[in-house]
Regions:
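Beta-propeller domains
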Residues: 1-476
Length: 476
């Protein structure tokens, strides 16, 4: 496994602006746009170490494509978390699984004035004409997509804000509207769906009460429905108020609750129904659509929430550790009533799934899912291959290279394409053998390498990003 953990989960990546990266192979002549990515820029502050892959200080990465060339820039998000860490040499704010060392007095004060991290490092999106770095806290940070300079905190409407949100908003391009889910913690907590439109007030569309809120990293959306999958990893909100331990360590796995699907009518905001299933866990929904009188929900599922603990850095540094396998499941919810049931679409290990969202979100004709995976011959360590799964046939295509650890595969469709998979896959790959990273460009149909652009340094393991054609970098 060489020095993969230190390279992928280590110290700060230097901030750089590079006009031209060395390119091997041939870039598509139609690829004119920008890949923006978000993730941790360091897992250490001074002598202190963050504890979990979902911790760290946010860094943005930008790969821009021109004729036969790729440029690169990266920059830390200039948040309070980052600025105070730089000034003091210490971790300043509580993160997903890391709590700053505090005196007893400091812990008592944190109960009355908890310092929520603004290190928005998980994903990014273009919402209401702004580019936002997204976190699971309600503090989302606007940035300039050209310079990567931090603009400031994006303010939601007071009626929308909760204490937790997903980093995977859904988009309805036909109506220029985005949707997201927030959780408000209280004596009776609520899940709330809201919409965001440029030039308009944000609107709460629906809410569901709950006494023990679940950890939900994403939610589903079909043509006519929102889907909240309430995994039985739940919290007593009082424990969060006391702030005695890091955020995720307040949650408990309660499999006796099962995993209900809450389905909401997109057009009326009314609850359609609750559809029970056996307990399982997931970070990522993939797609959802109506098929006859059934609602189909595809997601990457685990039998329990042990994957959360598997991402603690001390476990990821263990050369013999193996990640729990996430698998692509298709759940069918009978809208007339009854329990949800599922079928397995592939035996392949999967995480960080992507598909052609632009054309096939909520579309029953969608077929291909791309994801990071673990090679069956090299199961120890971290995600070390990419897979393409055909949801109709179960066929799996792979990309794997020794000592290489790819990140989220972003699909970019060829302009004017007819076939769903006519395009390329972009993935930032850590090359542990060389001690650097490179941007991999795969042909999405054959899954063969077309090109790679090599960086002079390793990029820490991040999470999510997106590709923006040249013109949409200008806000709508």
């Amino acid at each position: 496994m060489s020095n993969m953990p230190e390279l992928g989960f280590g110290q700060a990546t230097p901030e750089l602006v590079l006009d031209r990266l060395p390119v091997q192979g041939s870039l598509p002549d139609w690829l004119h746009g920008t890949l923006l990515r978000n993730g941790p820029g360091t897992f250490r502050v001074g002598q202190q170490q963050y504890r979990h892959w979902f911790d760290g200080l946010a860094m943005l990465h930008k790969f821009s494509f021109g004729p036969g060339r790729v440029s690169y820039a990266n920059k830390f998000l200039a948040t309070k978390s980052y600025q105070e860490a730089q000034a003091t040499g210490r971790i300043a704010y509580s993160e997903f699984a890391t709590d700053p060392c505090r005196s007893l007095f400091g812990r008592v004060m944190a109960v009355f004035s908890p310092q929520i991290t603004d290190s928005a490092k998980v994903s990014l999106a273009r919402l209401a004409g702004q580019f936002l770095a997204l976190a699971e806290t309600p503090i989302q940070v606007a940035f300039d997509p050209e310079t990567l300079e931090t603009v400031g905190v994006f303010n939601y409407e007071p009626g929308v804000v909760g204490q937790m949100t997903t980093v995977h908003p859904h988009f309805d391009e036909a109506h220029d509207t985005a949707y997201n889910l927030v959780t408000r913690y209280h004596r009776i907590s609520h899940y709330r769906i809201y919409s965001v439109r440029p030039g308009r007030d944000n609107q709460r569309l629906a809410q569901i009460p709950t006494k023990q809120p679940a950890y939900m990293h994403s939610f589903g959306m079909s043509q006519n429905h929102f889907i909240l999958t309430e995994f039985p990893l739940v919290v007593n909100p009082l424990n969060l108020l006391l702030w005695l331990r890091p955020y995720i360590e307040n949650f408990r796995w309660q499999p006796q609750r099962g995993t209900p699907f809450w389905v909401i009518n997109r057009h009326t905001g009314q609850l359609v129904g609750r559809f029970d299933s056996d307990p399982f866990f997931a970070f990522h929904h993939v797609n959802a659509f109506e098929e006859g009188n059934e609602l189909v929900v595809d997601l990457v599922a685990y039998p329990d929430a042990s994957i959360v603990n598997a991402y603690y850095l001390n476990r990821l540094h263990d050369p013999q550790a193996e990640l729990p396998f996430g698998q692509l499941r298709r759940y069918r919810l009978p809208l007339g009533g009854g329990r949800a049931r599922y079928e397995l679409l592939s035996e392949a290990c999967m995480e960080l799934p992507r598909f052609d969202y632009e054309r096939y979100n909520t579309n029953s004709q969608y077929r291909y899912v791309y994801a990071v995976s673990v090679n069956p011959q090299q199961r120890q360590g971290f995600y070390n291959q990419l897979v393409k799964v055909d949801t109709r046939t179960g066929r799996v295509q792979t990309w794997h290279e020794t000592d290489c650890y790819p990140g989220e595969p972003v699909f970019v469709g060829r302009p004017g394409r007819v076939a769903e998979d006519d395009g390329v896959i972009l993935s930032v790959v850590l090359d542990a053998g060389q001690g650097t990273s490179f941007l991999l460009v795969l042909d999405a149909q054959s899954f063969a390498e077309r090109a790679r652009a090599t960086l002079p340094h390793p990029v820490l393991f991040g999470y999510h990003g997106d590709y923006f054609p040249a013109e949409p970098l200008l806000p709508r």
